[in-house]
């Protein structure tokens, strides 16, 4: 009986220590991978206008150009030509327009224009 308990205890100790070694090995692999990735990464930020300069209906290049919380730089197709302009109205229906303005405001918030 004592031999059985000793064998079971030694197997449990061996399995726990093996798992701990495996966990430490994967943590080291992750650290090495992050270090390798970190050396080759080059982050560049695109310069955007600090203040809005366009009103609704004027030509634009990005959401940061357009003034207003719910005004975005959208596109309109005229024939085969695509024109970008500031716009805020999304629908003729008042309820859908209100929902669209809210969605435009959220999209404009994620444009990260620092004004």
Curated annotation (Swiss-Prot):
Gene Ontology MF terms: ion channel regulator activity; toxin activity
Keyword Acetylation: no
Location of the protein in the cell: Secreted
Signal peptide: 1-18
Domain of life: Eukaryota
Disulfides per UniProt: 52-67, 60-73, 64-113, 66-86
Keywords: Disulfide bond, Ion channel impairing toxin, Knottin, Secreted, Signal, Toxin
Propeptide: 19-51
Domain free text: The presence of a 'disulfide through disulfide knot' structurally defines this protein as a knottin.
The protein's role, per its UniProt record: Probable ion channel inhibitor.
Protein name (database record): U31-theraphotoxin-Cg1b
